[in-house]
């Protein structure tokens, strides 16, 4: 009987050990599950907060070392449907830019209008194959504009990838000027193309700026004044303008008055202007500097 009682006690102890072991496992599982729930809840709340909390706005500004424009919004006006700018020191000239898109132009009618100058496209580089092309109307337009007594400037639409290509574009322009005198600058007009297959789709701001520099250097070494054309997006996102301050700036901004706060010599204010002698919409410009005649 004593052995039987002792055996029963041992069995009870074993049973208690098994129950204690099972309880420990259960508690561990519950603790692990609780930790997992807390972790998942934390991740959810963090993700939800990121989705519903707006990102802080990032302000973008052009380097303050650029000189101010010096233009006053109060001096802008309108006469006969054209923009004007008249201050104590500046009376802006009205001009248009012309390419083969306008095809035939009645230059005498244009010269008899308030338009005092034209900026002619000399050529362009293809954004796909990169071929350099002369504007088919350039030679005719240049001769006719000079004969009509209009001031003349030039631009080249670039899709250069390297400074060497930009120099090639500049020399193409120079080869087309022949013996003609021009009064206004020769502008480098690089613009982004909304096509994923465009050759310049991945070009950097540093590369674009270097191309503009080489183009302008080549033009000025030949004795002409050089400039760079840009809109606000190109100014803020593509060019390092402080590296181009030695050249003239031609701003495109289609507003009542330009908001760009830094110095520029010419303002393209619309691409839907109408002038005598030109069919359809045309780019209109105000020039604030005395470049030409």
Describe every region a protein language model picked out:
Residues 174-188, 192-194, 240-263:
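Structural recognition of alpha->loop->beta junctions
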């Amino acid at each position: 009987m004593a052995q039987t009682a002792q055996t029963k006690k041992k069995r009870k102890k074993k049973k208690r050990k098994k129950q204690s072991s099972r309880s420990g496992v259960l508690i561990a599982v519950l603790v692990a599950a609780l930790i997992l729930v807390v972790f998942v809840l934390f991740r959810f709340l963090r993700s939800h907060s990121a989705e519903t909390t707006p990102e802080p706005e990032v302000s973008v500004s052009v380097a303050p070392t650029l000189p101010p424009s010096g233009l006053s919004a109060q001096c802008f006006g309108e006469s006969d449907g054209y923009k004007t700018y008249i201050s104590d020191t500046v009376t802006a000239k009205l001009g248009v830019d012309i390419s083969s898109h306008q095809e035939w132009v009645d230059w005498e009618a244009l010269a008899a209008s308030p338009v005092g100058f034209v900026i002619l496209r000399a050529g362009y580089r293809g954004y796909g194959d990169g071929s350099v092309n002369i504007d088919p109307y350039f030679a005719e337009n240049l001769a006719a504009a000079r004969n009509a007594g209009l001031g003349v400037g030039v631009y080249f639409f670039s899709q250069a990838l390297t400074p060497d290509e930009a120099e090639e574009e500049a020399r193409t322009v120079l080869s087309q000027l022949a013996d003609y005198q021009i009064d206004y600058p020769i502008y480098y007009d690089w613009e982004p193309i909304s096509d994923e297959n465009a050759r310049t789709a991945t070009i950097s701001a540093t590369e674009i700026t270097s191309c503009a520099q080489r183009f302008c250097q080549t033009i000025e070494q030949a004795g002409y004044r050089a400039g760079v054309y840009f809109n606000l997006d190109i100014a803020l996102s593509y060019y390092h303008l402080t590296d181009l301050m030695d050249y003239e700036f031609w701003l495109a901004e289609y507003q009542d008055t330009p908001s760009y706060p830094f110095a520029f010599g010419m303002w393209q204010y619309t691409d839907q202007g109408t002038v005598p002698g030109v069919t359809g919409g045309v780019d209109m410009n105000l020039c604030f500097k005395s470049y030409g005649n």
